[in-house]
């Protein structure tokens, strides 16, 4: 069985005088997991209440947050089970609660590693159905993606019951994320091309007919914004994903308890950084998220209501934009759409 988030406390208690410090470290780490769980609960609320994104993108992204939330709960159960002396480190297979929590955590890790590629896959559908994707949500797309994401997580958890399968699961996850990176670049290039076409006086039609209506222009702009955010997340979090995958891979080897502890520490650090950083990155790109977080901070007294922070207008690419330019561009688009209707 693949052992993740595992510290052999019995070994350190017998062979290492740093055992008291390790127990204190694990108690502190458990407190961090509790804080991270509260953080996940808050941003799950922000994600669904702010309604920044299309329903399908919100549901797929929300699944990632929910997975992190339940993964934290599973790890907290594992930590308390071990720290309170219920775990038999000499016969780890006999611990039903501990093994159940670890298996669930393995499912969460595999599913979480698939969530970003599935978010990009949802943008493929948004690009395919430019004409009416905003008006016709096609909720079955997100339902199917969430089902497939969880199915892959379950299959991964089953396969990793035999740690000899770890290399195959890791290879699949790395290839999937590499494919997602390439797909994201392709979608960005394609949407940028269409964006330039729909703002050009020369070409105002798709090659196969049909006009660049306001709905299509809006969807193209939304695709560019979300893909830019996803690209930033992929590049920024790529190093953490590599650390996470490597720690999982090394945990599958027959290594000493000390090295197992190092792998678990690297895995935990990657998850902490991942779960704390992604909401912050998304907040930087999402105006409604900033409004929701500031409103909450005002309610709890962490932000004064007297100070008003003016948010500059942003164009499709996230740059500052003067109000007059923004208004003129909007009416130019409206006039072009009216003339070509």
Curated annotation (Swiss-Prot):
One of its GO terms (biological process) is sensory perception of chemical stimulus. The chain crosses the membrane at residues 30-50, 57-77, 101-121, 140-160, 167-187, 230-250, 262-282. InterPro entries: 7TM_GPCR_serpentine_rcpt_Sre, Serpentine_rcpt_epsilon. Keywords: Membrane, Transmembrane, Transmembrane helix. It is found in: Membrane. It is a multi-pass membrane protein. GO terms for cellular component: membrane. Its main location: membrane. Belongs to the nematode receptor-like protein sre family. This is Serpentine receptor class epsilon-12. It comes from Caenorhabditis elegans. The lineage of its organism: Eukaryota, Metazoa, Ecdysozoa, Nematoda, Chromadorea.
């Amino acid at each position: 069985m693949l052992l993740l988030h595992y510290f052999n406390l019995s070994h350190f208690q017998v062979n290492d005088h740093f055992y008291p410090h390790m127990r204190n470290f694990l108690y502190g780490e458990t407190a961090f997991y509790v804080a991270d769980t509260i953080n996940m609960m808050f941003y799950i609320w922000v994600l669904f209440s702010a309604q920044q994104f299309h329903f399908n993108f919100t549901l797929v992204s929300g699944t990632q947050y929910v997975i992190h939330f339940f993964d934290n709960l599973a790890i907290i159960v594992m930590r308390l089970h071990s720290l309170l002396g219920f775990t038999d480190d000499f016969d780890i297979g006999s611990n039903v609660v501990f093994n159940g929590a670890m298996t669930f955590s393995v499912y969460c890790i595999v599913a979480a590693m698939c969530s970003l590629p599935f978010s990009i896959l949802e943008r493929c559908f948004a690009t395919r159905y430019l004409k009416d994707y905003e008006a016709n949500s096609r909720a079955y797309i997100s339902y199917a993606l969430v089902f497939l994401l969880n199915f892959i997580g379950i299959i991964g958890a089953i396969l990793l019951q035999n740690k000899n399968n770890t290399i195959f699961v890791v290879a699949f996850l790395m290839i999937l994320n590499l494919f997602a990176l390439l797909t994201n670049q392709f979608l960005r290039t394609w949407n940028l091309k269409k964006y330039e076409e729909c703002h050009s006086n020369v070409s105002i039609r798709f090659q196969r007919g049909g006009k660049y209506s306001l709905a299509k222009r809006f969807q193209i702009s939304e695709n560019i914004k979300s893909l830019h955010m996803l690209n930033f997340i992929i590049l920024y979090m790529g190093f953490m994903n590599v650390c996470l995958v490597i720690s999982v891979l090394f945990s599958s080897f027959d290594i000493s308890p000390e090295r197992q502890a190092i792998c678990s520490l690297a895995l935990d650090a990657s998850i902490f950084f991942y779960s704390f950083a992604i909401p912050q990155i998304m907040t930087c790109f999402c105006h409604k998220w900033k409004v929701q977080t500031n409103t909450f901070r005002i309610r709890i007294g962490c932000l004064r209501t007297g100070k008003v922070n003016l948010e500059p207008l942003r164009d499709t690419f996230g740059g500052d934009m003067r109000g007059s330019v923004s208004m003129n561009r909007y009416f130019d688009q409206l006039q072009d759409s009216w003339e070509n209707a």
